[in-house]
Swiss-Prot record:
Disulphide bond pairs: C83-C98
Family statement drawn from the similarity comment of this UniProt entry: Belongs to the Wnt family.
Main localization, broad class: secreted
Protein name in UniProt: Protein Wnt-6
Pfam families xref list: wnt (PF00110)
Organism: Evasterias troschelii (Mottled sea star)
């Protein structure tokens, strides 16, 4: 007589918070690169940075300085932008408001959400 066993395996997605945290870590550790002459190599602009792997986050152009007026946009005011007044990180009011000060306003709203995952 023989026996039969069945094993089923699957991978579980991490929580959105964990995914966001991992992306933020990669964002903070990202390196600016230029393309190599062979069309497939990425070369770090900073010679002290190791060449990126396929899993590293890289960028090729600097982000615009949103604190400086841009003649291509209609206005450069950052009014109505949500920020975290206690954070000293990228979402903090001091950074988002370019050190020009900000007014704190508490807004409470209710949203019906029928999210499914």
């Amino acid at each position: 007589s023989g026996s039969c066993t069945l094993e089923t395996c699957w991978e579980k997605m991490p929580s959105f918070r964990e995914v966001g945290s991992r992306l933020m870590e990669q964002y903070k550790g990202s390196a600016k690169v230029t393309g190599g002459n062979d069309g497939g190599t990425l070369i770090p602009e900073d010679s002290t940075v190791k060449p990126p792997s396929e899993l590293d986050l890289v960028y090729s152009m600097d982000s615009p300085d949103f604190c400086e007026p841009n003649p291509r946009t209609v206005h450069s005011a950052r009014r109505g932008v949500g920020c975290n007044s206690t954070s000293m990180d990228v979402g903090g009011c001091d950074i988002l408001c370019c050190g020009r000060g900000y007014v704190e306003e508490t807004v409470i709203f209710q949203v019906n959400c029928r999210c499914r995952f």
